[in-house]
Amino acid sequence: AIPAVEYLMSKAGGGAKRWVLLGTDYVYPRTTNKILRAFLHSKGVKDSDIDEKYTPFGHSDYQTIVADIKKFAAGGKTAVVSTINGDSNVPFYKELGNAGLKAKDVPVVAFSVGEEELRGVDTKPLVGHLAAWNYFQSIKAPANTEFIKKWSTYAKAKDIAGHKDKPLTNDPMEATYIGFNMWAQAVKKAGSTDTDKVIAAMAGQTFTAPSGITSKMDEKNHHLHKSVFIGEIKADGQFNVVWKTPGPVKAQPWSPFIPENKGKKDEPVVVAAAPKK
């Protein structure tokens, strides 16, 4: 989330000064926005320039919320960081269009809108808005061409509904692909499928991702170091990559922007085993 906000703050991203943090009411959006609010404070953004809103799962009436966003945006260059979940994204973007809020005026960056979510929906209200992922199908790289080809061949051979005629790849698929290949490498290194031996062998594993960039599993916490891409939604449901990190971002399981994480190292918390009876 932080790289996406840094992009929107930049000249290339529009130079946003005011922020709407809009999400579905559950733990991921609330934790993300807690981190983002603290990050924005560190950049000199005042609470008066941050508007935080939540809606229940399945929410579909965004008329009032979009009207509030439009009013808030009148106070200065505004961007929306969306952690809206699932089907609620469609009515939200539709209402933005109804209200005349265009991406060039109030850009929205989402963390749950990808190629699969855009399949079969009217993309007109979404064109120009943004999404942040570690992978997009449109990335130009030989490794990605090969990845898409493999999936296309498999989907057709297995007659997979929705993919046999129009195969799509997305971020969760890429993450699974990386994870499985790293696991296979670890099994080979360990010379065993024993869980503890494989876990130990996973530390430090590297793999060239479909993005063409080498991902690494952190030696201490087993989170991946991955690149971040910002993509602009196109009419065909694909993304035009407009920005990316210079390289993989180091895994950081304990955000320094949450006060209770102060002093925690980027490694797992060791919990003592319960005494045997």
In which residue ranges do the predicted regions lie?
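A structural signal for well-ordered alpha-helical segments within the folded catalytic domains
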Residues: 2, 30, 90, 174-181, ...
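Residue-level signal for short, function-critical loop segments
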Residues: 23-26, 135, 186
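Short catalytic/ligand-gating loop segments at beta-alpha or beta-beta junctions
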Residues: 162-175, 198-199, 211-219
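Solvent-exposed, acidic/polar segments of extracytosolic/periplasmic ligand-binding ectodomains
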Residues: 206-277
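Extracellular/periplasmic periplasmic-binding protein-like sensory domains
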Residues: 96-177, 188-193, 245-275
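Short, charged, surface-exposed loops that flank catalytic or proteolytic processing sites
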Residues: 16, 188-200
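Cofactor-binding loop segments of dinucleotide-utilizing enzymes, especially the Rossmann-like FAD-
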Residues: 24, 111-113, 235
